[in-house]
Design a protein with these regions (language model features):
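Protein/peptide-recognition domains central to ubiquitin and immune signaling
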Residues: 1, 78-99, 116, 126, ...
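Noncatalytic luminal/extracellular "stalk/propeptide" segments of secretory-pathway proteins
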Residues: 1-42, 47-51, 164
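Metal-dependent peptidase/peptidase-like ectodomains
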Residues: 103-106, 111-130, 237-343
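Acidic/His- and Gly-rich active-site-bordering loop/insert found
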Residues: 118, 161-190
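Acidic, glycine-rich active-site loops and adjacent beta-strand->loop/helix elements
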Residues: 48-50, 81-83, 187-189, 235-242, ...
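Alpha-helical metal-binding/catalytic segments enriched in His/Glu/Asp
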Residues: 167, 183-243, 374
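His/Asp/Glu-rich mid-to-C-terminal helical/loop segments that flank catalytic regions of hydrolases
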Residues: 209, 216, 345-378
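A non-catalytic alpha/beta surface segment that caps or lines the substrate-entry region
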Residues: 1-20, 108-170
Length: 378
């Protein structure tokens, strides 16, 4: 009958009045809150817009929720005629456990919860006012007097705490030691489902072993007297598959100041080929290289042209890319904080997020060549 957002809210108590505010919008000729005081009260809002009423724009759900918060609402209930369809279509998503950082949960507990209702649940809450509400909904009239009902809601979800680790390997630089380059890959995958093991050889075993190879190469260079000018932080992160959690934690609790972090090079799935490159394996997708720093982008291209000559494919770097890869790996938490990034990626293949993503399908010549780029860049 209802869903609660944010989904990671684990404890919530509400014992108060619920006030129906109609469509929950505020315009010069139509103000849902004109005669209503909802401060400290829960509000019920219809989705959509009133018919036969001219408004400057169409209000979406997010805008209605923000307005309710500004009015002081303690909780927002919103009726959606698409909820029942959504509950059936995405049942697996609603039923699976949600994972978040402990710090994130603390912040979420302070948020005003959103409860999305089916039509039946919404009318059940309004009880005796059901007929009046239907009339207002159909006509688009404003509410002149508050429709109130008492409400008691208790949410208490069982939770488990788990500990996971990011791994940090630090290589101090020389004359530019205070400038830090962070190189990341995620070492987690999907684990087991029943008796089936999801190995994640490409996603992101290839990135993880690349970090090991890069670390080894830097140590050999240091022994030979060739220290990097800038400091290097090599960081396999955890929790990527559960919401980029490891890199999010680091970005919120950085060991080295983010303002001193010159770039993040992120390696995620570089050992296979996608259908677009079945006949040309000498390529790599670069994502984000020019979003925050043209200098980083130009340096990347120059190094590749001089030493490797990979085909650099920027298809997924487009801001309107429907795949949204720019926001789907760990570099994104650095980019959100203004750190220039490059995401190295060889594309999605038929074994993506399947138990068949296994090691014998990896092209190690490809991954080995790419690790040289990272070593040379800085």
């Amino acid at each position: 009958d209802f869903t609660v957002t944010p989904s990671i809210i684990k404890k919530f108590e509400l014992n108060d009045e619920l006030i129906f505010v109609g469509y929950g919008i505020e315009e010069a000729n139509y103000n849902s809150y004109e005669k209503l005081d909802v401060n400290g009260k829960a509000v019920l809002i219809w989705n959509g817009m009133p018919e036969n009423v001219e408004t400057k724009r169409k209000w979406n759900i997010s805008e209605k929720i923000e307005l309710a918060k500004m009015k002081g609402a303690s909780a927002v209930f919103i009726y959606s005629d698409k909820l029942e369809e959504s509950l059936v279509k995405f049942e697996h998503f609603y039923n699976k456990p949600k994972i978040s950082l402990v710090e994130q949960e603390t912040e979420v507990q302070k948020e005003v919860p959103l409860i999305t209702l089916t039509e039946k649940a919404a009318y059940d809450l309004l009880k005796s006012e059901k007929r009046k509400v239907k009339k207002i909904k159909k006509s688009g009239l404003k509410i002149k007097d508050a429709f109130k009902t008492s409400l008691r809601l208790s949410i208490d979800k069982p939770t488990d705490n788990y500990t996971s680790e990011n791994v940090l390997a630090y290589i101090p630089g020389t004359d530019k030691k205070d400038e830090v380059l962070v190189i990341t890959a995620h070492y987690d995958h999907l684990g087991k489902k029943g008796d089936i093991v999801y190995n994640g050889a490409d996603d992101d075993g290839t990135g993880t072993v690349s970090l090991l190879e890069i670390a080894e190469a830097f140590q050999l260079a240091i022994k030979a007297g060739n220290k990097p000018r800038r400091s290097i932080l090599i960081m396999p992160v955890s929790g990527e598959e559960k919401g980029l959690l490891g890199s999010k934690y680091y970005s919120q609790n950085p060991v080295f100041p983010l303002e001193n972090t010159i770039a993040n090079l992120n390696i995620d799935m570089i050992g296979r080929y996608d259908k677009a490159h079945e006949n040309d394996s000498n390529y790599i997708y670069l994502i984000g290289s020019d979003r925050l720093s043209q200098e980083l982008h130009d340096l990347s291209e120059k190094v590749n042209e001089t030493y490797m000559n990979f085909g650099l494919d920027y298809t997924f770097n487009a801001e309107d890319d429907p795949n949204r890869f720019y926001s789907r790996s760990d570099h994104y938490n650095f980019a959100k904080n203004g750190v220039p990034v490059i995401f190295y990626f060889s594309g999605v293949h038929e074994d993506y997020h399947k138990a068949t993503d296994t090691v014998e399908k990896i092209d190690f010549d490809k991954t080995g060549g790419l690790t040289r780029i990272y070593q040379i860049l800085f």
